[in-house]
C-alpha cells in the first residue's frame, strides 16, 4: 500500500488519529481528522465532586512516549483511503495498548499527526511545535507510556511505593544533616533492603527508563490536565513517582547502596549514575507540574501545616508533603485548575524561567540537539523566538540567538558564567565562546552553581528580604548562617557597582564588553583538585607566608579551595578552619598510603622491567617505543626524544650488572616523574585515591561541611596562580598565558584567551580568584574587548 499523503493544515489546526476498534490479532486502522483547537468549556457543579468538568468540542487523548533509539518503521496504521502511515515499534506498542476492543478512540501522537517528512523546510513541524502546549492542555487526558514490562517491574514498583511512603524522611534535602535521613525513616518503619537485594537492581533499571529524560515529555506532562501513566501492564500513580524521586535524588544511601568500584572502566558507576539521573529527570518533570498546580504556594502551605510538628525532632516536616496531603490539595484546587485550563492559563503562579529550565534540564536528551532548546519554549512563553527547522537555522545560529536574547534582557552574568571554549583545540565550526553549550548532556551530579549564579541567588534572597518575603527560621529566630548571610550585600561582587556595558555584533557573532584586566596566568596545577590537600598546600606555600591581601597563606589557601563559601552558597563560618585541619589530616594519611602502594608497585614491577630489558629483542623494544609514542604523542610534548634516548641507552642497560641496573632504573624513573613529566605524574597520582573529595560513600564526620564545599569544586576546576602571586580556581581548559579579567556588571572574574586578532578574545570560563571577589580591583583601569 502507498504512503499516506498529508493534506495541508489551516492556521490553528491539528491532525488527530481516529483509531478504530481492534483486537490483538487485527491490524491497526483508522482515519486522520483535521481539528481546530478550541479551549474547552468549564462547567462547575454545586456538589463536591472534584470541582466540575471540562466540555471539549472533540475529546481526544494525547500520547506521551519515548520514540526509542530504533527509528525504523516496520509497522503501519492503515488509513481509510487504503494508504498507510508507517510507525516505529515503540509507537506500535503504545497504539496496541490504547486500541479499544469495542469502539474507536481519538488520539494525538506526534509521529502520526505532524507531517515531519514532506512539509516544505519542516515549516509545519515548527508551527505544530508552537501548538503543542495547547495540544496537551486541551486534551481530555494525556496517556503516558513508560515502556514495556521488563527488569522485575512489579518489584520496582513495590519498592517505589515503599520509598514514597517515607519520602518526607528520606529526602535528605529537608534535613540539616543529610546523613540522618535514612535513619529517621528507619525509626518510623522504613526497611532499607540489604546489599544484593533484587529490589535495588529492579528500582535502578526502572529509573533508567528513557522516558524520564526525554526533553519533549516535560511540556507534555506539565500541560496535561489529567494524566494516566502506564508501564507494561501496570497503572502507575505519578504522585508516587514524584515522592520517590524527591527521596532518591538527594539521599546518598539510596543512590549508592550496593555500589562497588569497577575494576576496569566505569560501566558499573555509569549504571548507578544513569539511575540517579532518571530520578532527577522524574523530579524535574513532576515538580514543574506540581508547582503549576500551586504546590508550595501560601494556600498549599496553610492547608498542609503539620499539626504534629512539635512532636518531630527535626524541622523538615513543618509543611507536609506526603501522598494524602498532595491529593487533598489537588482536590481543593481542582476547580480553579479546570477554570484556568478552560481560559488557556497553565501557569497562574508564574512561568518557569528559561535560563533556570536550561540548568535544571541539562541531563535531558533529544534526538536533534536543537530540540534541547525548542522543547522548552512552550513552558516559558518566550514568544519572540520561534522553532524553525531549516538548513540556515543551524544549532550554532539558534544557540547564539538564545544567548543574545538573554543578554539583552539583563542576564549577561549568568550567560557568560556557563559559556566558554568547548575543547583545548577549538574548531572553526564551534559557536562563539560567549554562547553556552546548552545542548551538551551534563549529569546533574556534575553540574554546579557557578560563582556568578551564587551571587545572583544572594541578590534574589536580599530582594525578597527587602520586600518582607523572607521567613524566619523555625521558632522565630534566624540561624547563625542566615544571620551571616544578611550581614553582606552579595556573596561575590568583583565588579562592584559597575554597570553592564556590551554590544552584540550579529554579523560576526561577537560580544563587546567592558572589562578590568587583573593578571596573567603563569601556572596551572594538574589534578582537577583531586591530588589531596597536602600536595596542593606544599605547592602553594612556595608563594611565601603571606598572601597579597595580608592573610596567612594557608588561610587564603583553604578559603580558595572552597571558593570562600559553604556548599550551599553562604559565607564561610569560623568552624570551617577546624574542619579544614581535620580534612588535611585525613588526606595526609591517604597520601601516605598512596605513596606506599606506589612504592610496592614499583618494587613488584622492577624485576619484570629488568627481565624485559635483557630478554626482549631490540626490535621488540623499538615496537614498544613506537606504540608508546603513537599513543601519547597527542597529549605529552617531547615524548619522542625520551624514546630515542631509551633505545640508544638500551645496549648499556643490557651490559650493566643487575646490581647496577636496578638503582639506575630507579634514578631514571624518579627523574622522569619529577623533572620531565611532573604534571603528567601528578595527574596520574589522583587515581590512587589521595583525596576524600573523590569519595562516593560516607565521609568523615569531623569535616563534613568543609568537605562538602570542597567536593563541589573537585573535578571542575584547577588550582592556578598569576604573575602577582594571586591564586584561584580556574576552568579546566585554562592555560599559562591566559588573562583573568573582571567583566563589568558580573559578580565573578573570567578567564580569557587572546586571539591573533587584536582586541579579540576567546572566553575560557568564569573563575574564583582569592582577594579580588569583593570589588578590590573594580576601580582599576578598564578596556573594551570583543569576545568571539
Enumerate the predicted regions with their spans.
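A general alpha-helical scaffold signature found inside nucleotide-binding enzyme cores
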Residues: 86-89, 127-131
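Short, well-ordered alpha-helix to beta-strand connector turns
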Residues: 139-140, 225
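Short acidic catalytic loops
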Residues: 63, 101-125, 136, 142-146, ...
Amino acid at each position: 500500500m502507498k504512503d499516506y499523503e498529508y493534506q495541508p493544515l489551516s492556521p490553528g489546526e491539528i491532525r488527530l488519529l481516529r483509531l478504530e476498534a481492534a483486537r490483538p490479532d487485527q491490524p491497526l486502522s483508522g482515519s486522520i481528522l483535521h481539528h481546530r483547537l478550541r479551549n474547552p468549556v468549564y462547567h462547575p457543579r454545586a456538589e463536591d465532586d472534584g470541582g466540575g468538568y471540562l466540555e471539549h468540542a472533540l475529546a481526544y487523548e494525547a500520547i506521551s512516549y519515548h520514540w526509542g533509539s530504533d527509528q525504523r518503521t516496520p509497522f503501519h496504521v492503515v488509513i481509510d483511503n487504503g494508504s498507510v502511515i508507517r510507525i516505529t515499534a515503540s509507537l506500535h506498542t503504545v497504539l496496541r495498548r490504547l486500541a479499544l476492543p469495542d469502539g474507536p478512540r481519538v488520539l494525538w501522537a506526534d509521529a502520526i499527526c505532524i507531517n515531519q517528512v514532506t512539509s516544505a523546510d519542516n515549516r509545519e513541524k515548527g508551527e505544530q511545535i508552537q501548538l503543542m502546549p495547547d495540544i496537551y492542555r486541551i486534551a481530555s487526558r494525556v496517556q503516558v507510556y513508560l515502556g514495556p514490562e521488563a527488569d522485575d517491574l512489579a518489584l520496582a514498583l513495590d519498592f517505589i511505593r515503599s520509598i514514597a511512603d517515607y519520602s518526607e524522611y528520606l529526602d535528605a534535602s529537608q534535613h540539616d544533616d543529610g546523613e540522618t535521613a535514612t535513619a529517621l525513616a528507619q525509626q518510623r518503619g522504613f526497611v532499607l533492603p540489604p546489599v544484593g537485594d533484587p529490589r535495588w537492581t529492579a528500582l535502578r533499571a526502572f529509573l533508567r527508563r528513557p522516558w524520564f529524560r526525554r526533553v519533549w515529555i516535560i511540556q507534555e506532562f506539565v500541560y496535561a490536565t489529567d494524566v494516566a501513566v502506564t508501564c507494561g501492564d501496570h497503572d502507575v500513580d505519578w504522585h508516587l513517582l514524584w515522592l520517590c524521586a524527591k527521596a532518591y535524588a538527594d539521599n546518598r544511601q539510596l543512590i549508592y547502596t550496593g555500589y562497588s568500584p569497577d575494576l576496569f572502566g566505569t560501566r558499573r558507576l555509569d549504571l548507578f549514575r544513569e539511575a540517579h539521573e532518571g530520578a532527577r529527570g522524574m523530579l524535574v518533570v513532576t515538580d514543574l507540574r506540581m508547582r503549576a498546580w500551586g504546590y508550595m504556594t501560601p494556600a498549599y502551605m496553610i492547608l498542609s501545616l503539620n499539626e504534629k510538628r512539635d512532636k518531630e525532632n527535626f524541622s523538615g516536616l513543618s509543611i507536609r508533603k506526603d501522598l494524602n496531603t498532595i491529593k487533598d490539595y489537588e482536590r481543593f484546587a481542582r476547580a480553579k485548575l479546570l477554570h484556568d485550563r478552560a481560559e488557556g492559563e497553565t501557569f497562574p503562579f508564574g512561568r518557569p524561567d528559561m535560563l533556570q529550565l536550561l540548568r535544571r534540564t541539562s541531563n535531558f536528551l533529544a534526538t536533534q540537539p536543537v530540540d534541547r532548546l525548542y522543547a522548552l519554549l512552550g513552558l516559558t512563553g518566550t514568544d519572540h523566538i520561534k522553532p524553525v527547522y531549516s538548513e540556515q537555522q543551524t544549532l550554532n545560529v539558534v544557540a547564539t540567538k538564545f544567548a543574545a536574547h538573554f543578554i539583552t534582557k539583563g542576564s549577561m552574568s549568568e550567560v557568560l558564567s556557563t559559556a566558554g571554549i568547548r575543547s583545548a583545540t577549538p574548531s572553526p565550526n564551534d559557536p562563539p565562546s560567549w554562547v553556552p553549550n546548552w545542548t551538551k548532556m551534563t549529569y546533574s551530579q556534575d553540574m554546579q552553581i557557578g560563582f556568578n549564579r551564587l551571587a545572583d541567588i544572594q541578590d534574589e534572597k536580599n530582594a525578597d528580604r527587602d520586600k518582607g518575603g523572607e521567613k524566619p527560621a523555625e521558632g522565630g529566630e534566624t540561624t547563625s548562617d542566615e544571620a551571616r548571610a544578611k550581614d553582606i550585600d552579595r556573596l561575590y561582587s568583583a565588579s562592584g557597582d559597575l554597570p553592564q556595558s556590551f554590544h552584540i555584533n550579529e554579523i560576526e557573532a561577537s560580544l563587546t564588553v567592558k572589562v578590568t584586566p587583573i593578571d596573567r596566568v603563569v601556572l596551572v596545577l594538574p589534578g582537577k583538585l583531586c591530588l589531596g590537600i597536602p600536595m596542593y598546600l606544599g605547592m602553594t606555600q612556595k608563594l611565601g607566608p603571606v598572601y597579597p591581601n595580608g592573610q596567612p597563606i594557608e588561610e587564603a589557601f583553604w578559603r580558595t579551595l572552597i571558593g570562600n563559601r559553604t556548599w550551599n552558597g553562604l559565607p564561610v563560618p569560623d568552624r570551617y578552619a577546624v574542619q579544614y585541619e581535620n580534612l588535611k589530616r585525613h588526606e595526609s594519611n591517604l597520601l601516605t598510603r598512596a605513596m606506599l602502594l606506589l612504592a610496592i608497585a614499583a618494587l613488584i614491577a622492577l624485576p619484570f622491567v629488568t627481565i624485559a630489558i635483557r630478554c626482549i629483542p631490540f626490535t621488540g623494544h623499538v615496537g614498544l617505543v613506537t606504540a608508546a609514542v603513537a599513543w601519547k604523542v597527542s597529549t605529552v610534548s617531547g615524548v619522542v626524544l625520551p624514546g630515542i634516548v631509551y633505545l640508544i641507552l638500551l645496549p648499556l642497560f643490557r651490559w650493566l650488572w643487575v646490581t647496577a641496573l636496578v638503582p639506575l632504573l630507579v634514578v631514571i624513573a624518579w627523574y622522569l616523574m619529577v623533572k620531565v613529566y611532573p604534571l603528567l605524574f601528578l595527574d596520574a597520582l589522583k587515581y590512587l585515591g589521595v583525596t576524600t573529595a573523590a569519595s562516593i560513600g560516607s565521609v568523615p564526620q569531623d569535616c563534613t561541611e568543609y568537605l562538602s564545599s570542597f567536593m563541589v569544586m573537585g573535578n571542575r576546576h584547577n588550582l592556578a596562580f598569576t604573575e602577582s602571586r594571586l591564586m584561584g580556581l580556574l576552568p579546566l581548559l585554562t592555560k599559562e598565558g591566559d588573562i583573568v579579567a573582571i567583566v563589568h556588571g558580573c559578580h565573578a572574574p573570567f578567564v580569557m584567551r587572546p586571539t591573533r586578532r587584536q582586541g579579540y578574545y576567546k572566553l575560557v570560563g568564569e573563575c574564583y580568584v582569592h582577594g579580588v571577589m569583593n570589588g578590590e580591583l573594580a576601580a582599576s583601569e578598564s578596556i573594551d574587548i570583543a569576545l568571539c
